[in-house]
């Protein structure tokens, strides 16, 4: 019986890792062992940062809403605005509110006025 070698399989596995490491600096894109480590670390960062991205966007939306609310009404703060929205029964999430504040300031001002009337 012929000896089974895994040349094609090993080559394909190495090629997959080295293709993933394309563009990395120095040996990280050329040497299989260091490329494997670099790709593994990159995947760890990617997994972690998918979770972090959600937090960052929520913080950004809150900052934008706060700035827009204060621009419309100097007395109103973000927390008072959110409480007033809940009291008014307006169920709009922060992403939509931030988008309104940036792209349609008149509509956002109307929402602020409606929330203030309910508060």
From Swiss-Prot:
Known Pfam families for this protein? Ribosomal_L20
Q: Which GO terms describe its cellular component?
A: ribonucleoprotein complex; ribosome
Biological process GO annotation list?
ribosomal large subunit assembly; translation
Record has Ribosomal protein as a keyword:
yes
- Keywords for this protein: Ribonucleoprotein, Ribosomal protein, RNA-binding, rRNA-binding
Kindly list the GO molecular function terms attached to this UniProt entry.
rRNA binding; structural constituent of ribosome
The answer to keyword rRNA-binding applying to this record is: yes
Q: What does this protein do?
A: Binds directly to 23S ribosomal RNA and is necessary for the in vitro assembly process of the 50S ribosomal subunit. It is not involved in the protein synthesizing functions of that subunit.
The entry's family comment says: Belongs to the bacterial ribosomal protein bL20 family.
Protein name as annotated: Large ribosomal subunit protein bL20
Originating organism: Paracoccus denitrificans (strain Pd 1222)
Question: Which lineage?
Answer: Bacteria, Pseudomonadati, Pseudomonadota, Alphaproteobacteria, Rhodobacterales
